[in-house]
């Protein structure tokens, strides 16, 4: 029997049964990972990280390093691969960690200094709460933001620079634009890149 999400947030250590995937044969990059409870003894509330890469994030990398952003305080941390239990089941991510995750820009995002944002990304909890917008400098960054948030957030929304919604995903499914609009856009793209606006 799975424990309720709120109980897991800092009161009891996450274990292998809380993971969707475990072992060395999986890629960790772009997923919420669970650090072993003994990495930070007495602080089981700091086990969840968004994996940003590292040579240890690749499959079958036993003692190489894994980089991650804490979903408790936003600090960047490095681990040995052997210190990672696995990837968290998305439904077990606590609300506060979802809000922290929503503020992380996609892996490989351009620095905001010297690059003008074209889109903003928002991720919402089921009750409508959100932390703040995340600036995104390209269509690729915008789509990467949606893909990294989609498994964990209730609603993900992309807006253009004028803050008009150009894409909305609810419960992992795109609801705007609908499939008919997408087919029309793909027909107009003529093999080139589609614009979200």
Question: Where do the protein language model's features map onto the residues?
Answer:
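Short beta-strand-centered aromatic/proline hotspots
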Residues: 32, 42-59
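Non-Sec secretion/translocation targeting segments of pathogen effectors
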Residues: 187-197
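Short aromatic-glycine-(Arg/Gly/Cys) micro-motifs in beta-strand/loop hairpins
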Residues: 106-131
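Mixed-charge, Lys/Arg-rich low-complexity intrinsically disordered regions
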Residues: 1-36, 97-105
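Intrinsically disordered, low-complexity, charged/polar segments
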Residues: 65-104, 173, 178-179
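Residue-level signal for glycine
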Residues: 73, 82, 122, 128-130, ...
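A short, charged, amphipathic alpha-helix used as a generic interaction element across diverse proteins
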Residues: 125-128, 133-160
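Charged, amphipathic alpha-helical segments
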Residues: 44-51, 102-107, 137-146
């Amino acid at each position: 029997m799975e424990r309720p999400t709120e109980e897991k947030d800092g009161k009891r250590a996450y274990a292998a049964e809380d993971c969707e995937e475990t072992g060395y044969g999986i890629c960790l990059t772009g997923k919420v990972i669970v650090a072993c409870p003994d990495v930070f003894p007495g602080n089981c509330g700091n086990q969840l990280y968004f994996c940003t890469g590292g040579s240890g994030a690749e499959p079958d990398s036993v003692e190489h390093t894994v980089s991650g952003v804490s979903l408790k305080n936003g600090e960047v941390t490095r681990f040995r691969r052997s210190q990672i239990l696995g990837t968290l089941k998305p439904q077990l991510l606590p609300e506060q960690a979802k809000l922290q995750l929503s503020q992380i820009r996609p892996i490989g995002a351009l620095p905001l200094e010297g690059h003008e944002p074209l889109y903003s990304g928002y991720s919402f909890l089921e009750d409508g709460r959100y932390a703040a917008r995340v600036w995104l400098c390209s269509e690729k960054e915008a789509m990467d933001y949606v893909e990294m948030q989609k498994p964990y957030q209730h609603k993900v929304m992309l807006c253009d620079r004028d803050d008009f919604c150009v894409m909305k995903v609810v419960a992992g499914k795109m609801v705007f634009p609908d499939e008919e609009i997408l087919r029309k856009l793909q027909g107009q793209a003529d093999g080139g890149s589609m614009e979200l606006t």
